[in-house]
């Protein structure tokens, strides 16, 4: 009977876990890393971005997002939406074409891959014959025209990827009709561009890289007109009236040609080099659009004078007498223009530019062409991210004040709404307001609305104004000088350069109830700031704190501290600094804690920790934790708190320098060289903090490097001296496994401004295994974590239980240990692992609840260096669930992880993107959206210039997708039946392929089974 009862108990416990815990990666925030292709559907109003890693991401109205991932690890080079369809085609670097669709399922859409195709060409053909360089999605929605490196144009029927061989355009067909005296006749080179006649879909313009352009009639299979260009062709634009063509070239010129039907046209009607007469770079893309406000808009990328501005990334916009060269800080990938009106044929309204590090949208209808603020795809890495901090359940008053401060900073943006509005966001409104704060290398802190799917920028705080830096305050990088030519104008916010790396933010702590903020930096600076709704000119009071306490024999060899401005500084509305603590030596601040009820800030570095009273502006205590053997702590910024990229770069630079110096000195001692390189590579691996080899928990010697480094600080009102009186206290954990406790005497509120705060050492714990202490939590008499400062005062948490025994939970890298207070006797412990070398990298307290029960449970959430997430019960410290989350090789992702109060988390998957995940069944933020097919699809009459019946068994619904998921599934099923050889014509095609006539038909039809990408969706 016992066994049966135990089994029932286990089942009940498993069900309880299922009700509370569920791991999901929900959405990616930020800007896609290494974008490589851009597409836009005017009918769907959806934007598509392909990346070098093979991802494809679709964006519409805020909250409408889709993501897919190609199986092939190849860059996406082109993205094309089928006109008036819900399908799109991607071309990869490996020359494969992929068909994707948005399919409705359970009242939401998913992005699915439904087919793939690779041109095979005739037997024995060289690869260039089928290497695709240009793609045209025909307006019929039924054809793809594929131009290749060898000059051929293949016609393929979609969505089944059936090659229509009789409609292909060979390079020989084109060459035979070119005048014999044309200089480029013998070698047309690759097809650079394909464009459909806007007035006659049966005519296509083929542009070859040597300069020849051919107007081809698809019905009659012959050329209509030749345009004999002599400069290398970059792009072509067909005017809306169908009577003129613009071509841009590699010498920085563009030409206008007239479509007359008279063959050939040897000279352009107009030729111009906008930034001549000296040699210019290529104009890679050109667009001209009519405007009711006067002359047309002429927009082109590139064309800059090669010698003077060849390194600039520019798009020029010319309209009437206005001419601007929009200057970006990263390479331009592609651009397009959004137009107003029915069928998007009206006035140009916005220029959308994808550059390597951001997406910029320019308002073309407002004077000055201001930038429209993006609600998503914001570059998180405008300056490199150095730390993150999440705050849940922000009070409405604080939220509105931060919003108002941000509005003061956004006056330079256009007031026009976001122009990309495809799809419907069906996700419910967020249940709470959440903030994500990111610290950056340039000394800024950015506030993001992290409540929903879109990570929206709210406010930016800059700390650089407090200090004297190398930047010239009169240096205005945003505007060109009067009369400058070309007329440059800086656009975008990506700025990879920092005025002074010492400004970098390392730690952030925000009190959501009081509006106080503490930020700490790379050069030992800790700023205390208060939210102010008005601009204010004030001094920042600086206090220098000597963490070495006058110890002799130590000499700081690292960076100098930042110079504080001694004059009053004008601070805009928002968070304004009023107090500064400067640590000496000016090492990286490794830990901070803020208690806004007591008005205290704790701070720690590799040398010790201190306590600062920001109410009375004085330092209360200092504790030096430096071990006499910690000589490395005097060398400068610590490798463990550097960016991973910097650590890797510096480590391998040392390796290279070592090898170079050895060669220079002609050292022939191979054994010595091998030993040195092995040591340096070992140092590099140590700095990378890779997963260690399998080992058991073992005691560490006290002479391990940086044992005095302070890893965590914690304020608690608990029993430290005796069990009858609780007192305020400060706890500190170090890299050497030591925990220090200080009892604080905080005067009552009415005497707080006059009486001093005092601190006295009370306890010291030394863990036997000396593993770094990464977290400290005090549990009340009921085993619950103590509430945040001011949380009880605002009636947002119950008062802690002070009658039972309190416990201190010490989280080291290798184990969790519970001590009773005030005796500090060990009660229980949990080893993270004994064999596989797992170490705790991130720890936080989170509250979990089921979807049906309002009751919440507190747990410990842990991320290890193996990339695994663990949920641990409190106060019993038992392992509840664990999930793999991050690859253990992704050191920067693990180091960047931040937990939320309700079981969610964020970590960097690239310098510009956060992955959001959830461990909770109750709190999940993910896209839930629907895209309806365009109206044209529902009453579409085929306008394809080439019509070929599909084989029996392939229904027309597959060609003209109606948006009905059931119909789509039936269609897909019938396509698969067709692929499974139920059709006579298929067998004939196979017979041909066996004879060598065609090799791709079967392969491509067998691949039409729908396959989901990495779908981000919320079906419940």
From Swiss-Prot:
Subcellular location: Cytoplasm, Cytoskeleton
Gene3D superfamilies, per the entry: YVTN repeat-like/Quinoprotein amine dehydrogenase
PANTHER family listed in its UniProt record: LETHAL 2 GIANT LARVAE PROTEIN, LLGL SCRIBBLE CELL POLARITY COMPLEX COMPONENT 2
MF annotations from Gene Ontology: GTPase activator activity; myosin II binding
SUPFAM superfamilies: WD40 repeat-like
Descriptive protein name: LLGL scribble cell polarity complex component 2
Any Pfam family the entry gives: LLGL
Function: Essential for hemidesmosome formation and maintenance of the cytoskeleton elements as well as cellular morphology in the basal epidermis during development. Also involved in regulating growth of the basal epidermis.
Cellular component, GO annotation: cortical actin cytoskeleton; cytoplasm; plasma membrane
Organism: Danio rerio (Zebrafish)
Changes seen on gene knockout: In larvae, basal epidermal cells migrate to ectopic places and hyper-proliferate.
Signal peptide extent: none
Chief location: cytoplasm
């Amino acid at each position: 009977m016992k066994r049966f009862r135990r089994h029932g108990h286990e089942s009940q416990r498993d069900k309880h876990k299922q009700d509370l815990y569920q791991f999901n990666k929900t959405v990616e925030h930020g800007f896609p890393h290494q974008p490589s292709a851009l597409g836009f559907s005017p009918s769907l109003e959806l934007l598509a971005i392909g990346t070098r890693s093979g991802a494809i991401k679709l964006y519409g109205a805020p909250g409408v997002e889709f993501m897919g991932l190609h199986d092939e690890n190849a860059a996406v080079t082109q993205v094309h939406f089928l006109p008036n369809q819900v399908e799109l085609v991607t071309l990869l670097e490996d020359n494969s074409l992929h068909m994707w669709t948005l399919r409705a399922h359970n009242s939401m859409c998913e992005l699915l891959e439904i087919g793939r195709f690779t041109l095979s060409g005739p037997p024995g053909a060289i690869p260039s014959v089928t290497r695709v360089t240009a793609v045209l999605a025909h307006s019929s929605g039924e054809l793809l025209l594929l131009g290749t490196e060898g000059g051929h144009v293949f016609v393929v029927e979609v969505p089944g990827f059936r090659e229509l061989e009789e409609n292909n355009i060979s390079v020989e067909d084109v060459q035979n009709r070119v005048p014999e005296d044309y200089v480029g006749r013998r070698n047309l080179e690759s097809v650079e561009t394909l464009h459909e006649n806007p007035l006659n879909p049966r005519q296509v313009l083929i542009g070859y890289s040597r300069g020849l352009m051919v107007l081809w009639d698809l019905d009659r299979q012959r050329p209509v007109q030749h345009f004999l260009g002599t400069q290398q062709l970059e792009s072509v634009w067909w005017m809306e009236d169908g009577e003129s063509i613009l071509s841009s070239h590699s010498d920085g010129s563009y030409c206008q040609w007239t479509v007359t039907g008279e063959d050939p046209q040897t000279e352009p009607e107009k030729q111009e080099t906008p930034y001549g007469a000296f040699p210019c770079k290529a104009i890679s893309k050109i667009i001209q659009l009519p405007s009711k406000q006067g002359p047309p808009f002429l927009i082109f990328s590139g064309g800059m004078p090669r010698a003077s501005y060849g390194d600039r990334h520019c798009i020029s916009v010319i309209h009437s007498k206005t001419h601007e060269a929009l200057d970006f800080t990263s390479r331009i990938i592609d651009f397009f223009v959004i137009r107003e009106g029915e069928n998007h044929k009206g006035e140009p309204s916005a220029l959308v530019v994808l550059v390597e590090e951001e997406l910029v949208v320019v308002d073309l209808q407002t004077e000055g062409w201001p930038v429209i603020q993006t609600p998503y795809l914001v570059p998180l890495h405008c300056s490199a991210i150095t730390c993150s901090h999440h705050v849940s359940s922000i009070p409405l008053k604080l939220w509105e004040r931060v919003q108002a401060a941000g509005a003061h900073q956004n006056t330079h943006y256009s007031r026009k709404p976001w122009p990309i509005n495809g799809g419907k966001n069906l996700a419910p409104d967020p249940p709470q307001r959440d903030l994500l704060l990111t610290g950056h290398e340039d000394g800024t802190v950015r506030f993001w609305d992290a409540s929903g799917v879109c990570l929206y920028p709210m406010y930016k705080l800059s700390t650089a104004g407090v200090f004297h830096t190398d930047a010239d305050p009169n240096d205005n990088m945003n505007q060109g000088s009067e009369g400058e030519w070309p007329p440059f104008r800086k656009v975008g916010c990506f700025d990879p350069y920092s005025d002074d790396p010492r400004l970098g933010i390392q730690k952030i702590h925000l009190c959501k109830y009081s509006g106080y903020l503490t930020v700490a930096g790379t050069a030992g600076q800790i700023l205390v700031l208060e939210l102010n709704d008005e601009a204010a000119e004030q001094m920042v009071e600086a206090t220098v704190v000597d963490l070495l306490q006058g110890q002799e024999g130590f000499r700081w060899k690292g960076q100098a501290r930042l110079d504080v401005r001694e004059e009053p500084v004008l601070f805009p509305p928002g968070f304004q600094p009023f107090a500064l603590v400067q640590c000496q030596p000016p090492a990286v601040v490794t830990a901070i804690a803020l208690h806004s009820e007591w008005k205290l800030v704790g701070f720690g570095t590799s040398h010790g920790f201190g306590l600062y009273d920001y109410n009375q502006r004085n330092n209360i205590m200092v504790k030096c934790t430096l071990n006499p053997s910690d000589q490395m702590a005097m060398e400068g910024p610590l490798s463990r708190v550097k960016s991973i990229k910097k650590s890797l770069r510096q480590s391998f630079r040392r390796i290279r320098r070592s090898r170079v110096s050895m060669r220079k000195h002609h050292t022939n001692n191979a054994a010595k060289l091998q030993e040195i390189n092995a040591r340096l590579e070992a140092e590099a691996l140590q700095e990378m903090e890779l997963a260690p080899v399998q080992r058991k928990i073992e005691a560490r010697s006290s002479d391990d490097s940086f044992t005095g480094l302070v890893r965590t600080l914690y304020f608690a009102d608990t029993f430290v001296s005796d069990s009858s009186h609780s007192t305020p206290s400060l706890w500190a954990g170090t890299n050497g496994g030591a925990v220090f406790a200080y009892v604080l005497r905080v005067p009552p509120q009415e005497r707080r401004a006059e009486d001093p705060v005092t601190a006295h050492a009370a306890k010291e714990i030394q863990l036997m295994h000396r593993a770094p202490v990464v977290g400290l939590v005090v549990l009340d008499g009921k085993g619950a974590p103590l509430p945040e400062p001011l949380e009880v005062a605002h009636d947002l948490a119950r008062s802690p239980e002070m009658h039972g025994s309190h416990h201190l939970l010490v989280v080291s890298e290798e184990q969790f240990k519970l001590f009773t207070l005030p005796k500090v006797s060990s009660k229980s412990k949990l080893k993270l692992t004994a064999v596989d070398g797992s170490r705790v990298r991130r720890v936080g307290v989170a509250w979990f609840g089921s979807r049906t029960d309002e009751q919440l449970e507190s747990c410990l959430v842990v991320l290890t260096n193996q990339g695994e997430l663990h949920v641990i019960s409190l106060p019993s410290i038992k392992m509840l669930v664990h999930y793999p989350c991050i690859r253990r090789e992704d050191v920067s992702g693990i180091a960047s992880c931040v937990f939320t109060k309700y079981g969610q988390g964020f970590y960097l998957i690239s310098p510009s993107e956060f992955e959001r995940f959830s461990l909770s069944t109750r709190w999940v933020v993910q896209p839930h959206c629907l895209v309806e097919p365009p109206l044209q699809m529902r009453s579409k009459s085929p306008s394809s210039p080439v019509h070929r019946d599909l084989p029996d068994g392939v229904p027309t619904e597959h060609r003209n997708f109606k948006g009905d998921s059931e119909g789509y599934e039936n269609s897909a099923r019938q396509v698969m039946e067709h692929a499974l050889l139920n059709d006579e014509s298929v067998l004939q095609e196979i017979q041909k392929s066996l004879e060598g006539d065609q090799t791709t038909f079967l392969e491509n039809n067998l691949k039409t089974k729908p396959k989901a990408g990495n779908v981000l969706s919320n079906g419940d």
